[in-house]
Amino acid sequence: MSLRDEYRRARQDEELARLRRLVALRAMRARGMTQREIAAELGVSQPAVSQQLAGDVALRGVDPERLVAAAGPVIKSLAEELGYSRLGVFGSVARHEARQDSDIDLIVQAPEGTSSFAFVGFASMLEEVLGREIDLVEYGGLAPGLDADILAETVPL
């Protein structure tokens, strides 16, 4: 790999890291934390948190594949905190066919006894964190003919 390629790769890594930090802050905010609480948790100043959130890029304009690549570890951690497991992406993002305006299709194993209200709330939280429309389905929660197709293309996060 050439030095130019190494430089470009490093720039891409920086962009993914910036997006991941932003998504992590949005996740903390979605969980009800104040900027002051976030700052204390991270060991940074509240103005630093405020500045990062104020510089919040329009995540709607971020390529869905790049957004999932950056946000995957954050939303997986958020899901696990809430008892969800086996988080994966399917659909156009998994097939590398997503357009700029594509939604993100996620599949997850909900905790035992999760109500429909709680499941919809989790989907709404993911939309808030990622800044775009999310289609969230549960393993086994689709029509039998569709499950096989979705499972075949699901990429674990």
PLM ranges: what are they?
Residues 89:
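Conserved histidines in hydrophobic membrane contexts and catalytic metal-binding motifs
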Residues 106-109:
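Amphipathic, hydrophobic secondary-structure cores in small proteins
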